[in-house]
């Protein structure tokens, strides 16, 4: 038995990231006040409710303890576009996890094309087959946490004609979702 209070935050993260799997990846697109596009992946992300349609994503801080650009942008604009990551975008998505200066756009730096779908929201990554256009519903204050959970309400959803299966996170690796297993029937 492992007592969590005896572990460091890094050990807790490793334990949770290894065994709470697979974790979907929210490839979040935001814009700052000047319209600069920020794109970053987050795997502490999950559906939360269908009424209202919402997800939760936990966003950490930079090494200097200031909010990551994604968090700062969502706090200011109250909006985010979450793209699900198809396998063909894995490398660019992974590159976009690199910390850049706030005045540098991941879209430009890593050559990630975007396309505007809804004027009042950040653009989506061009070529992804599923995107959620969200508004900030609630920021959760977890006392002592190094991450900030955000509840984002889904206002619009884009689904391509032939949506691709998104990749997921398993530990520190990525995974393609494979064969679907049929659920056993329940006795009456």
Predicted ranges, named:
Residues 1-188:
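Basic, polyanion-binding surface patches
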